[in-house]
Amino acid sequence: LDFDAASDEESLLTFRNTFGPDSFAWEEARAVFIGLDDVIYQPGTKPAYIGGLRDDQFNFLEAYLPTVPKDRLLVLGVHIPLFDAKPGIETFRKTDRARLFALLKDFPHVLLLSGHDHTQRHVRHGAENDWHGATPLHEYNVGAACGAFWSGVKDAAGIPDSTMSDGTPNGYA
């Protein structure tokens, strides 16, 4: 995310020029993997971003998902979790979450992987979060290999242990 960009679209240019598309999919024998940039940059606001999806991403999903066999494992990777990380504060746009969940509800095997929070957490989405699939949707908030950035008790060399808030040590995600 380029915080110097004038718009959400411009904030993705460096990523796209370095790595390629910010929305993509690939298929393996029994699984389909979808990666989506779900960071919506809002220049000049506080906070400067919110979790959500763009119209072009929904267009991609609406065109692609009908081609995916329902017996495949569907793995979605995003950055910002789809659950609201802070009670009472919308950290992922509810309308986008409901729209995404409506597209996924007929897939019986879905795993949602998210990051951003530098902690590990398992969330089971149900009707209270607009998930209407046959079973709860499993979201695994993976944590971060860097741990909790440069925080925590310092070792003899002055390097902090960076243990995540859930107790996961640096280097494990």
Each predicted region: which residue ranges?
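Active-site flanking residues adjacent to catalytic metal/cofactor-binding acidic residues
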Residues: V78, G115-H116
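Alpha-helix capping/helix-boundary segments
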Residues: L82, H118-T119
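Short acidic, glycine-rich surface-loop motifs adjacent to enzyme active sites
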Residues: L65-K86
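Extended active-site neighborhood of metal-dependent phosphoesterases/phosphodiesterases
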Residues: L1-K70, E90-L113, T119-Y172
